């Protein structure tokens, strides 16, 4: 396998840098490729797109591997960003990083890798793969549970996983930084990127308002009484506390308010008081657009655990697969702030089974 040509997605961050280094050290024929998915040079608070490219180039030069750039901005706009806007317009809260992995990193990029004559792609995700007895590949959580990224990778199928390597999946994040420092990689102390890939660290509200006209409306309490005004339903997520702008409501205790529901028909945001208000909790959800890593669901009904957001602790649940492919999920314990548009991802211990979009 050591003669195989591996194309590493190099982002200019420490995780992909160390992934490329480890593969080179293991004797593979490695090429680093930087994917540019967004045209505007979005100078964020700590690093511009040009800086990411420069860091990626420096890492490849340091390791001694070829460096290439590929522009997927058109594909990203058509297959990720327009869907992102459509979802927000509909009052849902999408996760573009999941769609980016599905449409760009493990689809458009994979096709490009084939053009380069690559045998495998590699990324700096904290995840692992495992080939089981029947020859199929499982998607397994990364060793560093606090950094596990299988939540973002649940749309990957067998064909993609058979051609993918996750070199740092078996390593703790702290060790990844040590390896980068020991090998004098410029990214060793670079801050982890947060936020949506095309927004960087900019204020989300400012960014979204450039693309979608906001429609202001009223904020009501659970009894339908007006308690404030909102700037546009798309700016709010279920369970959100910050930025509601509700304060000093007459005859109400000084307890924080949280976004609980969106009444799209009437353009009303419903807010409730208290982090643990019953309206913020549900023990059931329905999901559509299911992706199963193995190619199909484990059974028509099964027990497993699930996450309704990244970094949430796995929650025990029962899953029922409907005739149309959607699923009904019943949790053993009520879950806070289940959010339409986000993904629910299913696990059997450390094995990621797949997931879908919450409606």
Curated annotation (Swiss-Prot):
UniProt binding sites for ATP: 9-16, 35, 124
Keywords: ATP-binding, Cytoplasm, Disulfide bond, Nucleotide-binding, RNA-binding, Transferase, tRNA processing, tRNA-binding
Stored Pfam families: tRNA_Me_trans, tRNA_Me_trans_C, tRNA_Me_trans_M
Residue(s) at site: Interaction with tRNA: 125, 342
CDD domains (alphabetical): MnmA_TRMU-like (cd01998)
Organism the protein comes from: Francisella philomiragia subsp. philomiragia (strain ATCC 25017 / CCUG 19701 / FSC 153 / O#319-036)
Enzyme Commission numbers on file: 2.8.1.13
InterPro entries: MnmA-like, MnmA-like_C, MnmA-like_central, MnmA-like_central_sf, Rossmann-like_a/b/a_fold
Protein name, as recorded: tRNA-specific 2-thiouridylase MnmA
Domain of life of the source: Bacteria
Function: Catalyzes the 2-thiolation of uridine at the wobble position (U34) of tRNA, leading to the formation of s(2)U34.
KW Cytoplasm (keyword) present: yes
Region named Interaction with tRNA: 147-149, 309-310
Localisation per UniProt entry: Cytoplasm
GO cellular component: cytoplasm
